[in-house]
Amino acid sequence: GRPGGQQVLLAHATGFHARCWDQVVAKLPPDWQIFAVDMRGHGRSSNSQPFTWEQFGDDLLRVCEHLKLKDAIGVGHSMGGHCITHVTGHNAAFFKHLVLVDPVIFDPELYSAKREQASMSVEDHPVAKRRNYFASVNEMLERFSDRMPYKVWQREVFEDYCQYGLLPVADGEGYELACPGYVEASIYLGNFDANLYQLIRNIEVPAVVL
């Protein structure tokens, strides 16, 4: 986009990556300045612990500070919606509008129930056992193309998800998930301590929740 144009920050869901937004970006005005972020453990960012929800929110807060956002449009999907909310609760000057797509913000009573998940180890979580290796991008495309939810996705979005969601194996042939199963499982098990309600009280920015 064009520096000085309307700023937009796009934050992806758990297990996704910044390039999942490519088809959305293509439909936005070409003179807007658009930023899409790979959260830690996703895309081209490093798999550096901790994978806590507060840490993801703080990471995005630092990104906003580095980019010097002001009156941007903040768009977040799932975990990304949580993080956009976290950032806005700390500094509302970054955004003038929020678009939160299925944001991970639970009913207050559910946070106590979520704490019970802490007894499950990452290794025992079903997501941690997900296949991590693929011989090619096409193999991943073929494996998931007829499965939910991927089979109802726009084809171009699904192709972006696969193409940019894999990294070359460091010590061999083939590809591995940029967001390995153990990282995704760690995030799901960490949502019990992600109570945003103190920050939400600070937010007066107009928001659309989908």
What residue ranges belong to the model's regions?
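Short, hydrophobic alpha-helix immediately C-terminal to the catalytic nucleophile
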Residues: 22, 61, 85-89
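Structural signature of beta-strand start/N-cap positions in the alpha/beta core
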Residues: 7, 31-33, 70-73, 94-97, ...
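The conserved SAM/SAH-binding core of class I Rossmann-like methyltransferase domains
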Residues: 9, 35-37, 77, 101, ...
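Conserved HGGG/HGGXW glycine-rich cap/lid loop of the alpha/beta-hydrolase fold
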Residues: 1-49
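The alpha/beta-hydrolase serine catalytic core
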Residues: 115-150
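Conserved serine/cysteine hydrolase catalytic core
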Residues: 156, 166-210
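Active-site loop/oxyanion-hole signature of alpha/beta-hydrolase fold enzymes
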Residues: 23, 35, 39-79
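Conserved hydrolase catalytic core segment
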Residues: 70-115
